[in-house]
Regions:
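NTP/phosphate- and nucleic-acid-binding module
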Residues: 1-180
């Protein structure tokens, strides 16, 4: 039985022998990015005892990686709140990626921002723009806004002059959510 020997054939022809090889490296980000998103995704039951279930979808992204860092939300679209909110957004967009949202109730806007992973929501309300209370006394909350944290849903009142520094410190001191 005759068998063909490639090595012997190459020697007889005087050709060099080559061993074919292929190195194909792949460093795709699709799986890694999907894993990153799945790890950050959470559905929380935020219903109070005795109430029907109410789930909140949250994307717990690190603030340095979130597509939107700060959302500016006027409490209402009227009475000068929207204009003041736009002014604040303009101030913040020099340092952060911002979003401005006026559609729906403020609670629904918070939920939408939680879903896309926005770590901070700045709410502009009547205390932000009114220098005096209805009784004529000075308003201590004038030129302040409410900052809401995505992960804990806690809210904190912050002076407009300190807002950029406050958010920068909050980003620097961010602690990831630990889930069981």
């Amino acid at each position: 039985m005759n068998t063909f020997n490639l090595f012997k054939s190459d020697q007889e022809d005087g050709n060099k022998k080559y061993v074919p090889y292929v190195i194909e490296t792949s460093a795709g980000l699709n799986r890694n990015f999907l894993m990153f998103l799945c790890e950050a995704y959470e559905e929380q039951n935020v219903a109070k005892e005795g109430e029907p279930e109410d789930y909140r979808t949250v994307l717990h992204l690190d603030p340095r990686l979130a597509p939107i860092t700060v959302a500016v939300l006027p409490l209402m679209k009227k009475d000068g709140l929207a204009e003041k909110a736009k002014e604040i957004q303009h101030m913040l967009k020099e340092d952060f990626v911002t979003d401005y949202d006026t559609s729906g109730t403020v609670g629904k806007r918070y939920r939408r921002q939680d879903e896309v992973g926005t770590p901070f929501c700045v709410t502009v309300d009547y205390d932000t723009i009114q220098e005096k209370k209805e009784d004529g006394t000075p308003n201590d909350l004038f030129n302040t806004v409410t900052v809401r944290y995505r992960d804990s849903m806690e809210q904190e009142r912050v002076a407009l002059d300190d807002l950029v520094t406050f958010i920068q410190k909050a980003i620097k001191n961010y602690k990831p959510v630990v889930r069981a």
